[in-house]
């Protein structure tokens, strides 16, 4: 979605010309869930004057009830009309930043927190941090009650066409809706697993790209239901097939120059690119809980399903955590392959950026690239060349996060503490459950 700039007068004009009936004021909580306050268009002036309030104590991870009043400050550049609402009175969306009653940004707002880390980046002389995400999702059939089943919509494979790929019509409608909302779609295809899909859209600056991810998820789920399908961004909904990732392709800029590109070096990369990569590798264990926030996330990060399990980097090899795609010039970027679509994009990107800046500020040295298939190396071979494992459970990821000051700085005290507390509860709840697998394994034997 290309960057646009709107004024209050523009918004008033759009609302009147398009006969908008409702305004949806959208924000994202710490767990990555989209929240919204919907108001009639008669409240537009109040919205434009940053006077819309909501109860922050009702949002998980925000505040206690005694300090609950919050204000929504809309980002006017995020104005869009949902195409599917035309028949019932048009609904427009504005993404908002959350502010406290004293007029300062709320420390628990992931979007505002990302802006804080971007300011730190600017203080180091960089002007832009761009993100190109690659979100994947599964489509499951709905039952007669509208509940998701475990029946996939097709048995297609990577880049398959209809009739094997029965989700093609749904995917095409999703693309059309996204384009109507201003997205620049680059590709749309079936992924490796049956029922799995990927739609790639053009990179954008950090905040806009994260806004786009949240909008993308909403559109995918909405249009899927119109096709009697349930779209899920759960990282590993099925055993024995590839899970869904959301690779982050990131690049730093100084003005119009890509700070990662140097045509005079062997790999075409600058010292800044190597230092940034070194910082991401150094802090990878610490940010894994943020980039892979569910118990289920770690069912994806296992050998054999094209997801990274090991902390290393390479130019072409897809088995390490970081890959440097072959494009150079303005397209020079690094691809962080561990991120999954359940991640809060604002928090995941803040953690990755802070990690990279840690590498730049401390002039960290990147290890040698690993060009062999790490999945085929045994533990002794990996340890001999200094390759660490990513955390294998949410519990070990949270432990690594608690020990990492860079990630604490990336998220700020409020988000950091609330996230760890919420995810620790989730882990404790999971570990005390008795699963169907356990009953199948042990009920008769013992």
Curated annotation (Swiss-Prot):
The lineage of its organism: Bacteria, Bacillati, Bacillota, Bacilli, Bacillales. L-glutamate binds at residues 242-243, 300, 306, 318, 337. Oligomer of 12 subunits arranged in the form of two hexagons. In its feedback-inhibited form, interacts with TnrA in order to block its DNA-binding activity. Its main location: cytoplasm. Inhibited by glutamine. The record marks 64 as: Important for inhibition by glutamine. ATP binds at residues 186, 251, 318, 323. One of its GO terms (cellular component) is cytoplasm. It comes from the Bacteria. It is found in: Cytoplasm. It comes from Staphylococcus aureus (strain MRSA252). It is an enzyme of class 6 (ligase). GO terms for molecular function: ATP binding; glutamine synthetase activity; metal ion binding. This is Glutamine synthetase. Binds 2 Mg(2+) ions per subunit. Residues 110-446 form the GS catalytic domain. Glutamine synthetase (GS) is an unusual multitasking protein that functions as an enzyme, a transcription coregulator, and a chaperone in ammonium assimilation and in the regulation of genes involved in nitrogen metabolism. It catalyzes the ATP-dependent biosynthesis of glutamine from glutamate and ammonia. Feedback-inhibited GlnA also interacts with and regulates the activity of the transcriptional regulator TnrA. During nitrogen limitation, TnrA is in its DNA-binding active state and turns on the transcription of genes required for nitrogen assimilation. Pfam families: Gln-synt_C (PF00120), Gln-synt_N (PF03951).
